Amino acid sequence: AGARVTFVGHPLADTVKASMSYEEAMMFFGGDRVKKRILLMPGSRKNEVEKLLPAMLKAADILTEKCECQFFLPRAGTISSEFIQGFLKNASPRLDIIVTAGRIYDLMRICTACIASSGTATLETALMGLPTVLVYRLSAITWFLAKHLVRVEYAGLPNILLHKEVTPELLQDKVTAGNIAEVVLLWLTDEVKRQENIRELKSVRAVLGEGGAVRRTAELILRTAEGK
């Protein structure tokens, strides 16, 4: 409508970074150097966790059959420990899984791959260069409306930004333990493929712009207020 627009960048370009070294993070989280370390991020809302965590845990069991794996499950502040434990008590007893809280970017730093709910988490893992498979389930009516009303090719923010699927997406009935494990296993067993994905993810940071978005926004507001 003729308004002037200035792109100042994205605040996540500033905030998404590890505060610990790799060695410090390994010690802090109890990372196993022998095992492949996989991050499970089922979401911050109960309904998300209920729909996604069971499939993630079953996929974790399949992966454990194929190679030595250690899993990390960061608990969102909106989710109680008791709620998470309700799912873990029904998981395979052979799973090596650690529930964590806080320092999520340091945790991402030491992980080999990630299984994450759609949302900001996939943008954060992309900025951290962590290969991630996106999983998400909506109610049947919401999915129907979304398919007919929302005109976007992808669900994941990294894919929307880059106009291609750098973060594999499994939606609705494709969210199965077998499908999830198949994607992740490729990264666990083929380091060349994993590094290719990491290189693609670097483009996300380039699209979001340089750091300093908050500072530039404040400066722009001040200049506008002063009539400059």
Regions found by a protein language model. Name each.
Residues 1-228:
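Nucleotide-activated sugar donor-binding and catalytic core shared by glycosyltransferases
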